[in-house]
From Swiss-Prot:
Positions where Phosphothreonine occurs in the chain: T229, T603, T727, T817, T936
Name of the gene this protein is made from: Cp190
UniProt biased composition (Acidic residues): 608-625, 802-812, 1076-1086
Ranges where the record places region Involved in microtubule and centrosome binding: 1-209
PROSITE patterns: BTB, ZINC_FINGER_C2H2_1, ZINC_FINGER_C2H2_2
InterPro entries, sorted: BTB/POZ_dom (IPR000210), SKP1/BTB/POZ_sf (IPR011333), Znf_C2H2_sf (IPR036236), Znf_C2H2_type (IPR013087)
Polar residues composition bias: residue spans: 175-213, 220-230
Full protein name: Centrosome-associated zinc finger protein Cp190
Superkingdom: Eukaryota
UniProt-recorded Gene Ontology molecular function terms: chromatin binding; chromatin insulator sequence binding; DNA binding; DNA-binding transcription factor activity, RNA polymerase II-specific; identical protein binding; microtubule binding; POZ domain binding; protein homodimerization activity
Organism of derivation: Drosophila melanogaster (Fruit fly)
Sites of Phosphoserine modification: 197, 211, 233, 298, 319, 610, 708, 723, 745, 748, 757, 760, 920, 925, 927, 938, 1071, 1074
Tissue-specificity statement: Expressed in spermatids but not in mature spermatozoa. Localizes within the spermatids to a sheath of microtubules around the nucleus and to microtubules within the tail.
Lineage: Eukaryota, Metazoa, Ecdysozoa, Arthropoda, Hexapoda
Ranges where the record places region Disordered: 126-308, 366-449, 608-630, 710-733, 770-927, 960-1096
């Protein structure tokens, strides 16, 4: 055979691992997928996993595989398994310090001895760091103890962890070297026929120096990844050349390691010191072995034994320098409550907290029964309320349990659950001596953990998942779903976030599915106390239990309340405890039927009045907010001026006293537009007094009175009095009449509103026919009731419709009208004559128009008069009786003066007649334009005004035609005109002061008068208004008087023939005007103005 030469690459293992890592990172050639409980997946190579451990081979045979996805058990979390898999590919273990216990436990379950030794080396490093951080304690001598290996057994030295890289345990060759002290455990492995190693036949066990874990990492130069030291690592020393060579030899030995490891240690004891970085973890760890510098002494020392029920606690401490051991023996066969045991230990021995040392705790049952449970070591924190445990924030007691294969122990997660929930339930699994079956986790957090299969089943249920947990995979991160704590929040999340449509048959609170809508509402009412707005459920009056239907309630009554269902309503089958309750129910809900059947009687109210007093009062208070104020249109209401209120003070006081005796009512005055009218107290009293005096047939003026219901106190008082008296309610006669009047006024208001335009047209037609009929009525006897009623109704309509709002609008229009009047006054006498004739037309038209038009005409006349007259009238009601006495004397004096004046001006009048005849159409057009401007400025109704203009034009044409005739009757009527001049001066001035015609007393307005007297009165009003204008216009005195007299004579022609009724009509006009008039500042004691005297 030829010579065989072997050539190898020293770093082939590193290169091979890097290639595998690249495939792993790119998920190339991966033939197995690990799926965890949080739905995260990890793709791996079966060959790599099988080369490191047999655990996954066993797992594939025992666990479920779905589409090449191996469903991992609940105990193996992704955050623990992923670092271990990365370690298999890279040889670097990257983990957080708080994950140490979980990694150690998982490595034991997987039986990965290399990983266990790596973690053990990291623990020793942390132990050394903690010793350096405590200067008072002596520095320990580190020595590495070597076991007795068999021939060809290489000893391993492990590579430390790096925070970034994925880790792998590196086999270490055995070389002869000086021995260094270290506290560690010997790890050996059997190389089952490893022929590849050149050192396989070595018979000498070489001892090598052991350097700190981080120094080994710095000596690892062949790895491409940068090495980073741990934050807790001590200051590293420079590696010596000898250590570098040793590490190179160890690299060559990696490929010589066999696939099977054996743990020859009879008992694996370990412990770990915690700091505040991971002091709160529930990680498991072993107790550290006793330092080898001090020889193990025989169990001597003090033992303290206490009996606590059936549990015996023994504190064993061989020497003061050694860590004490606590042995707990339980003589009972019940499950051990480890929380209570540790709490009792800390209470009995509080001094063990001060030493800050690990303490061995062995829990042993007294019975020699073979144990069937095994658990990993655990650490325990002392309670936070222990005063001795609060000496330092980071110096906490950690009690480690010594693993005893013959005794059942507690797991860390079980300990955490028991310490939090104070429950002694512990569940552990596993067959002793095997690590294939993992222990079950029973902590509170573990109970919420589910595998991926269950998770997908819950997610598929969607809103029908009534048990929880409620998970949403779409909103999760990296394949991990989010958990929503409640079903209601989960349902809202699906609707609002994912726009899903939920079955309406599902309960929105718990997801319970109902058959129909009524059943769903009943479920929500019973289970979630949500009252239904659609359905009412039958309730048992005896036990207050609700039922979905009346049939179920009846069945319940028949079964449960067989002897109690005597008080049952015969109409609705409702059951009551007492007979009185049944009677009230029948009286409230079945009164008509009960009265017909004779079950109840009206006289029974007398006996129930005293019993129901309090309940009815409470019922009235509850029902009172539902009784809102009733709106009733009472009648035609006018707003009085403050000057005329004092006349009726006595009547108002009397009415006020009567109102106080009656039930008090809150009165609100609302206009036609719906807004409340603000009035003074005197105005409110005046309106109320008018309402009491009005007739049922009076027309409505558009003002609404709102009468709210009486207050609860008055209702309660009346109810109490009437119930005690046992009599029915009785009303005052005044209340009955007022209600009847209000009802009639409502009907009349509706009728008048509907026929408002029709009545306006009727008024105009009546005004036209009145002049033609006046001549016939003067020669005949006055006809009886019907003409009188027509005239009185028309007068009421003309004088009643006058509101404050219209006057406000008229006052606003006065400045513009005054400017127009001043311009007309500065012109030639011709415009003056036109203006006077226009005023005459307006005065005539005021008698023939409807209520709205009359108001607008009066406002236009008042505006012109106010511009010419600089003196304001002062109201004086007390002077009215004197005016009435002097009117006759003033009329005689003015008549004599007027005759002389008329004779002097007769020639001038004749000269002006022809001028007036020729220019008569011009004032007609001017008056029409001026009237239209006044109508536009005020509120006005357009349709009615157009008809009024047409009729007024016809009247003007007739007056102009009659003005051409000789004034034969001028002397006859002159005395009557002079007699009323004084009163008309005051009446026009009162119109400037906005004194409404409604101040005329009701008795005077109701007096029946002949039709002839009414016609004469209207004509005299027109003539006196014209005479007023003639007297006040000084520059054109003569022309004003003559032009005003001619149309006036023609309009009053019919009234002059009725000589028998003239005296009565003059007195009537005086009585009407005396109440309107106010005294001017220039009037004398007889009520005659200075301007009138000067003209006369």
């Amino acid at each position: 055979m030829g010579e065989v030469k072997s050539v190898k690459v020293d770093n082939w293992g590193v290169f091979f691992l890097q290639k595998l890592q690249n495939f792993f990172n790119k998920t190339d050639y991966c033939d197995l997928t690990l799926q965890f409980r949080d739905n995260s997946q990890l793709k791996v190579h079966r060959l790599v996993l099988s080369a490191c451990t047999d655990y996954f081979n066993v797992l594939e045979q025992t666990c479920e595989i779905v589409d090449d996805a191996l469903i991992m058990p609940n105990e193996f979390q992704a955050d623990v398994v992923v670092p271990i898999v990365n370690f298999m590919y890279t040889g670097t273990l990257e983990f957080e310090l708080k994950m140490y216990g979980k990694l150690l436990r998982t490595a034991k379950e997987m039986n990965m001895t290399v990983l266990l030794k790596l973690l053990e080396a990291h623990r020793r490093t942390m132990e050394n760091v903690n010793r350096q951080q405590r200067p008072p304690s002596p520095k320990g001598i580190r020595r590495r103890t070597v076991g007795q290996p068999s021939s060809g057994l290489p000893q391993q030295r492990v590579l430390g962890p790096s925070p970034q890289s994925r880790n792998v345990a590196t086999p270490i060759a055995q070389r002869a070297n000086t021995q260094r002290g270290s506290t560690g455990n010997t790890m050996s492995r059997t190389s089952g026929g490893s022929n590849r190693s050149p050192y396989g036949d070595s018979s000498n066990v070489k001892q090598e120096p052991t350097s700190p874990f981080e120094q080994l990492r710095k000596g690892y130069n062949n790895n491409k990844r940068p090495a980073q030291t741990s934050l807790l690592s001590p200051p590293s020393k420079k590696p010596s050349l000898e250590e570098v060579k040793e590490f190179a030899e160890q690299q060559r030995m990696r490929k010589q390691i066999a696939a099977e490891y054996g743990d020859n240690d009879p008992e694996y004891d370990g412990g770990m010191l915690y700091d505040d970085v991971h002091a709160g973890d529930d990680d498991d760890d072993d107790m550290p072995p006793q330092p080898s510098t001090s020889k193990q002494q025989s169990p001597q020392g003090t033992q303290t034994q206490l009996e606590h029920g059936s549990t015996t606690i023994i504190l064993k401490q061989d020497s003061p320098s050694q860590t004490p051991t606590i042995i707990v023996k339980d003589s009972s066969n019940a499950k051990l409550n480890h929380t209570k045991i540790i709490a009792e230990v800390l209470r009995q021995y509080p001094h063990i907290v001060k030493g800050h040392k690990n303490i061995k705790l062995k829990i042993m049952p007294n019975t020699p029964a073979a144990p069937t449970e095994k658990s990993a070591p655990a650490t325990v924190k002392p309670p936070a309320n222990q005063s001795s445990a609060t000496t330092s924030p980071h110096k906490k007691l950690h009690v480690s349990f010594k693993a005893d294969k013959s005794t059942p122990l507690i797991t860390a997660q079980q300990k955490a659950a028991s310490s939090q929930q104070k429950s002694g339930t512990s569940q552990t699994t596993g067959n002793q001596g095997t690590g294939a079956n993992p222990p079950a986790n029973t902590a509170a957090a573990q109970k919420r953990r589910i595998d991926s299969k269950t998770m997908h089943a819950l997610i598929a249920q969607g809103a029908e998942n009534t048990t929880g947990p409620w998970l949403c995979l779409r909103c999760g991160v990296n394949g991990r779903p989010i958990s929503i704590p409640s079903y209601r929040g989960f349902r809202r999340h699906l609707i609002n976030t994912h726009k899903e449509t939920i079955d309406p048959a599902l309960c929105e609170h718990c997801g319970w599915r109902s058959v129909n809508n009524r059943e769903l509402h009943f479920h929500m009412y019973m289970e979630h106390q949500t009252k239904s707005l659609l359905y009412t459920f039958a309730e048992c009056a005896l036990c207050n239990q609700s039922y979905r239907t009346k049939g179920e309630l009846e069945a319940h009554i028949n079964e449960v309340h067989t002897d109690d269902n005597k008080q049952q309503c015969i109409y609705c089958n409702k059951v009551f405890e007492q007979e009185l309750q049944l009677y009230r129910h029948m009286k409230s809900y079945h009164k008509e039927q009960a009265l017909e059947d004779g079950i109840i009687d009206e006289t029974d109210e007398e006996f129930l009045g005293s019993q129901d007093e309090e309940e009815e009062a409470e019922g009235d208070e509850e029902q009172e907010p539902e009784q809102t104020g009733k709106v009733r249109i009472l009648s035609d209401i006018s707003l009085p001026a403050t000057s005329a209120i004092t006349v009726q003070q006595a009547q108002q006081e009397q009415l006020q006293e009567e109102d106080v005796e009656q039930v008090q009512q809150e009165v609100k005055f609302v206009g036609a537009d719906g807004n409340e009218v603000e009035l003074t107290d005197e105005q409110r009293k005046e309106i109320l007094s008018q309402l009491n005096q009005q007739q049922a047939g009076a027309t409505a003026g558009g003002v609404v009175m709102v009468l709210s219901e009486p207050e609860a106190e008055h209702v309660k008082q009346e109810t109490d009095e009437k119930s005690l008296a046992g009599t029915e309610e009785e009303y005052d006669d005044s209340q009955i009449y007022s209600e009847l009047g209000a009802a009639d006024s409502v009907e009349s208001a509706k009728k008048n509103i509907a026929d408002e335009s029709k009545e306006s047209i009727d008024n105009l037609e009546w005004a036209e026919n009145l002049i033609a009929e006046s001549e016939e009525q003067s020669n005949k006897e006055p006809k009886s009731d019907k003409p009188r009623d027509d005239i009185s109704e028309k007068l009421k309509e003309l004088t009643g419709d006058w509101t404050e709002d219209e006057n406000d609008d008229d006052v606003d229009d006065k400045p513009a009208t005054a400017e127009l009047a001043s311009e007309l006054a500065n012109k030639d006498p011709e415009p003056t004559v036109h203006e006077e004739e226009d005023d005459i037309d307006l005065a005539l038209q005021s008698l023939h128009k409807g209520p709205e038009e009359a108001t607008e005409e009066k406002a236009s006349e008042e505006s012109v008069t106010s511009a010419d007259d600089a003196v304001d009238a002062v109201p004086n009601i007390n002077s009215q009786p004197e005016k009435m006495d002097v009117d006759s004397e003033a009329a005689d004096e003015k008549a004599s003066k007027a005759e002389v004046q008329i004779k002097k001006e007769a020639e001038l009048e004749n000269d002006q007649e022809e001028f007036i005849k020729e220019d008569s159409p011009i004032p007609h057009s001017d008056s029409v334009a001026e009237l239209r401007e006044a109508v536009t400025a005020s509120e006005g109704e357009d349709d009615v005004h157009l008809e009024a203009d047409n009729i007024r034009k016809e009247l003007l044409d007739e007056l102009i035609a009659e003005a051409e005739k000789p004034d034969q009757e001028k002397d006859i009527v002159q005395s009557e005109e002079n007699a009323t001049t004084e009163a008309l001066d005051r009446s026009v001035t009162d119109e400037d002061d906005l004194v409404p015609p409604t101040q005329v007393s009701t008795e005077q307005m109701e007096i029946d008068e002949p039709a002839a007297e009414k016609a004469a009165e209207n004509n005299e009003d027109t003539r006196t208004a014209d005479e007023k204008e003639a007297v006040e216009d000084k520059p054109n005195q003569t022309q004003d008087v003559t032009t005003a007299e001619k149309p006036t004579l023609e309009s009053a022609k019919a009234g002059d023939e009725a000589t028998s009724g003239e005296a009565a009509s003059v007195d009537k006009v005086k009585s009407l005007i005396s109440e309107w008039g106010d005294d001017d500042e220039d009037e004398d004691e007889n009520g005659v103005s200075a301007a009138a005297k000067e003209e006369l």
